[in-house]
Amino acid sequence: MRTQPVQIQDSIGRILCNPVFRSSGKKIFSKGHVMSEDDIRVLTGEGLNKIWVSQLDAGEMPEDQAVTSVATGIACGSLEIRVTSGGRANLIATEDCCLLIDDDLLKQINCTAAVVVATGVNFSHVKTGQRVATVKSAPFAVSSSQLETVTSLLRDRGPLLQARPIRKPTIGAVYADACNGDRARGQFEHVMKQRLERFGASPDYTVNCRETEFAIARSIQHLLRAKPTAILIASTVTPAGPEDAVGQAMARAGCQIERFLAPVEPGSLFLLGYKDDTPIISAPGCFRSAKPNVVDLILPPLLARYRVTGWEVACLGHGGLLA
């Protein structure tokens, strides 16, 4: 790309390097504006003779075209692309959803120097109309060879961002304590409703029971018949892992235990399992507080019907210190 001052009459089709103002201070054209014949008449009428312009060389792509190309390739799901002036494309959620980010691929793309991409946080919950990512290029033009590096990465690895919709999730809740579950319900019910409302969900099916392996297993099996999006187990006893009453009950109900312990504070004593495609969570004791904890990090992808793995739980440690 070449940048130089030229006579006004020689600027047709070239790109303004700087904004142009009237003597009164009012802007006539913005930086990045492509000059036309009508524009020349306007500037001549303002008494201007020369302006600084850029001209693309062979093998370069205009900035807006470049960011549109990258924005189209980096994402999938419930999104739309909105191109703004100055070589920027924003990705906007078209419905409530959960973001899934390939962090390694994002880093590779941001090392190409052709464009940069900024995204929301992996597993974050986003609302309709919220910006979830932005793509920005260097001013005016991008090298086609650098852009090809980016598109090649995307062809090989797939999109780096998914916006998985969260559509009418249903939740099953088990309240368990040493007696009949009433005390557990009293401690957890209000905050559970409050927490789920943040994600457009509610405890649709609830069961009270004693905290024994058999009683909790029966409660899980009962809730599974309703085919909820997820099941939360709230107990007055601090979780102790797969060998405690809740963990044994999950196994008895046919669950595969995916992960015990999360590198998140508060909420490290967290147990996740699956019965077929239904996630079942033994909530940590901090769940009774409305303050952010591990459940807030895990719920969005589960409500979007994404199967969170033990490895992905382990990766929550970076940024997992919530309080």
Model-assigned labels for residue ranges:
Residues 1-86:
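Short, low-complexity N-terminal leaders and the immediately following helix N-cap/first helix
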Residues 14, 18, 27, 49-52, ...:
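Structural motif
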Residues 28, 34, 122-125, 263:
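Residue-level "contact hotspot" at macromolecular interaction interfaces
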Residues 45-49, 72-79, 128-137, 197, ...:
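Generic secondary-structure signature for well-ordered alpha-helical cores
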Residues 53, 79-84, 142-144, 202-206, ...:
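Flexible, glycine/charged-enriched surface loops at secondary-structure junctions
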Residues 57-166:
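Extended, charged alpha/beta regions that create polyanion-binding interfaces
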Residues 128, 139-230:
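Phosphate-binding glycine-rich loops and their immediate beta-loop-alpha structural context
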Residues 204-323:
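Short glycine/threonine-rich loop/turn motifs
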